[in-house]
Regions:
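N-terminal low-structure segments adjacent to metalloprotease catalytic domains
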Residues: 1-47
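A transmembrane-helix-recognition feature enriched in membrane-embedded lipid enzymes
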Residues: 27-64, 113-124
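Hydrophobic (often cysteine-bearing) scaffold residues that line and stabilize catalytic clefts
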Residues: 41, 99, 131, 135
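Active-site scaffold of zinc-dependent metalloenzymes
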Residues: 69-96
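Active-site recognition of the HExxH zinc-binding catalytic motif
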Residues: 100-112
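Post-HEXXH active-site segment of zinc metalloproteases
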Residues: 112-141
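Short helix/loop segments within enzyme catalytic domains
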Residues: 141-152
Length: 152
């Protein structure tokens, strides 16, 4: 995925507001659903879904890097944007899997561990715009290749 060449004016302030809004939402979630045995079940379910989907469609190398199972060579229609983290599985195409990108995806893995079954729903509510999606912002917009280096 190519970064947004020139992020729109005011994007940093909007990103900060998105993170703050996300933290407010977190306070509404019952404590026993976050970083708990329940969320771990959701994380492992996500890992299972990621493994099955990756195993079905990956024609590239499958390797473990930085605590993630990386499924390469996925057809473009099987994942959004430049790749997708489902549980502890990073599903991607033929693009470069850099240390920065793995750092970004490792944060998503940690988010899956924290939120479990809630992760897909919360991510959906956060929206498709990475500059306003609190999960992408927390994972690092530069590392995720959403904005050019030096702009975040």
């Amino acid at each position: 995925m190519s970064p947004i060449p020139t992020p729109p004016a005011g994007w940093r302030a909007a990103a900060e507001r998105s993170v703050i809004r996300g933290r407010r939402i977190d306070r509404l979630i019952p404590w026993f659903l976050l970083d708990s045995p329940i969320s771990r079940v959701g994380y492992w379910y996500g890992c299972t879904v990621g493994w099955v989907w990756g195993s079905l469609w990956s024609v590239g190398r499958v390797e473990q890097r930085e605590g993630l199972w990386v499924f390469r060579g996925m057809p473009r229609w099987t994942f959004p944007r430049g790749g997708s983290c489902v549980g502890g599985c990073f599903l991607t195409g033929d693009g470069a899997v850099t240390p920065a990108l793995l750092r970004h995806e490792a944060v998503h893995k940690r988010q899956w561990q924290r939120y479990g079954f809630l992760m897909p729903l919360l991510y959906l509510f956060a929206g498709r715009d990475p500059l306003r999606n609190r999960f992408e912002i927390e994972a690092g917009l530069e590392d995720g290749n959403y904005v050019p280096r030096g702009t975040a």
